[in-house]
Amino acid sequence: NILDMELGVNVFDMSDPTRPVRTARLVTPAMLSPHESLVVSQEGGVLAAVLGNPAFGPGIVDIYDVSEDCRNPVLKSSTPLGLFGHESGISPDGKTFFSGSPSTSTLVALDISNPSLPRPLWAGQYSSHGLSISPDGNRAYVASIGDPAGMLILDISEIQARKANPQVREVSRLTWDTVTIPQNAIPFTRNGKQYVMEVDEYSGGNGGPIPVGIHGPNVGAARIIDISDETKPKVISNLRLDVHNIANREEIASDPGAQNPTGGYAGHYCNIPTRVNPTIVACSMILSGLRIFDIRDPANPVEVAYFNAPVKPRVLTLPAPASNWAMSSPAFVPERKEIWYT
């Protein structure tokens, strides 16, 4: 937004998706550069973010009330309690906000049940990128850039219960052969069975993540993880495109945009429309656009649709090219059968 001279977080009324109407622009500290941390709890009526950037920011957390009118968020607090900022998570009830910074290996939990007076609950040394919280608030599913990179399942029940001096316990950790930079991990159930949908961003070399601007041979992409036994999670399927397969990487290396510093042929975010019996996963696959997978059989996902938006010139085109690539976490309007992304 700064590069396009649209400073801050812009709020739009999307009642008519063909004619979006901007209703507010949020320019408090965290909203000037929330990086990947912007989260909403519909149940709690809360919008929150932590000041961040591609490395890490100083951890200022902004909390807005959106319970009355989400088109006009009301600032409740702006405090330097996030320690360091890059990514985040929020409990479904909107009472706990997590500030994650993989570069500094810090994860902070804040009590935001009173959004005007947030308070620290816990801080730990985890290289957390994005994280999602279970419906009961007792588990955190962490996309970890630690050693090894992969997914962590953390027992955060003492934070949820607001115990004094809460302790967080590691339930399990998992990695995979194609791991690059784990981006986010989202739990869901399908026919009563528990899974996690996890996505890695960008590409890497055989020795792990490499600079984003390099067309690496190894693409993390996305996967479905069976967590029926949360102490022994296992990858049961992958959400990948042909351009992600190592055998094809050299052939496509000279394609326009393949060496794009913002990611080229790789993944960035995936999301599901519901955590209970979702039928699809939508993924922002950067240069490959929006890709839709049928996951009714989680062990055998099938790509069923894709969309590459028309090129729209930017005010500034360096380092990023004209914007027809997909980066954001897809959002859903199921009643209108819509998917939104940028």
Language-model segments: residues:
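Feature marking well-ordered beta-strand scaffolds used for ligand recognition
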Residues: N1-T342
